[in-house]
Amino acid sequence: IRYAIEKGAELVAAFDINPAVLGKDASEIVAEDYPKTGVCVSPAEKAEKILGSLKPDVCIIATRSTVAELEDIFTICAKHGINAITTCEEALYPWNSSPALTSRLDELAKAGNCTLTGVGYCDLVWGTMVTNLAGSSFKITKILGSSWYNVEDYGIALAEGHGAGFTPERFEKEIANINHMSEAELKELVESGKYVPSYMWNQNGWLCSKMKLHVTSQTQRCYPTTHSEDLFSETLNATIKAGDPTGMRAVVTTETEEGITFVTECVGKVFAPDEFDRNDWTLVGEPETTISVNRPATVEMTCATLVNRIPQLIDAPAGYVTTDQYPYNEYCVHALNTYVKSRNL
């Protein structure tokens, strides 16, 4: 909210499901001493009525992680012709994980003459940063990506979803069971919505689309991470014994007709004292190039990337349009409306 307002956007409505903030000025969500906005937080169930009445240029959605969870609000926005942009991780490139739902949303958005899209930290640090860097290569044969994050920062559900604190046997049974599936079986499971793959599943699809590559195969394998000494997890309120799973490495491998292979991984685990959030990307070829982003301000970068994408969202064609189809993101020095090219705001 703060980033959008300070870049010249006008806040006209805000919604939440948290009873503690309902009816309060939206400034209380932003910061304790933030100036009053004059906009009160409304219950999420009133979103359709209020949005349909106000018809804002853009709706920012920062709630959930899968497109299925956002189907209702995306549908509301499409119905009323409101452009929608979300930090939902899958929404960055849902064509290879929820193709049927994405196609339905695409049709609804085209009928409503508006655009739906997903952005965030991954849009830039895992996306345009990589493809822009590729412009300095003569030949690329493989792209390696690795993103580390501390599951202690995201609550018990995510920690357990990564197998932190599991026994090796439980990890193999509940998480690594997909390692024994064929590519076709895994694809069917992902597209059924019964299994949510690693963020890199969607990211590889985004990268291939941006680079105009044609995917021939894609698989994911999950492996436990371990530590040589006991580690105490504050989130789990338990000590993880040396050698037991501290989390998970989810490795996505994508092959393309053009001969470029992607091997990307998300490493989510209980960090040892000397570990930190990091992102490393290597372009293998001529020349070989590696870029690293250590200790990134993930939340701030997610919000800033979204706000800087708003003018491009407004200018984009109608439909579910992923950001690989957008121009490269840019830092908006001036008010957001001055970057909109398709109409005067």
Features from the language model and the residues they span:
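Short, ordered loop/turn segments at secondary-structure junctions
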Residues: I17-P19, R64, C88-L92, Y121-C122, ...
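Short alpha-helices
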Residues: K110-K139
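Active-site-lining helix/loop region of Rossmann-like oxidoreductase modules
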Residues: G135-K269, P273-D277, P296, C303
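Glycine-rich, highly charged phosphate/nucleotide-binding loops
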Residues: E32-K49, V67
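Rossmann-fold NAD(P)-binding glycine/threonine-rich loop
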Residues: E69-E71, T75, C88-C114
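N-terminal Rossmann-like dinucleotide-binding module
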Residues: I1-E32
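Rossmann-fold NAD(P) dinucleotide-binding segment
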Residues: A47-V58, V67-E89
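C-terminal helical cap and adjacent loop that interface with cofactors, partners, or active-site loops
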Residues: V270-L345
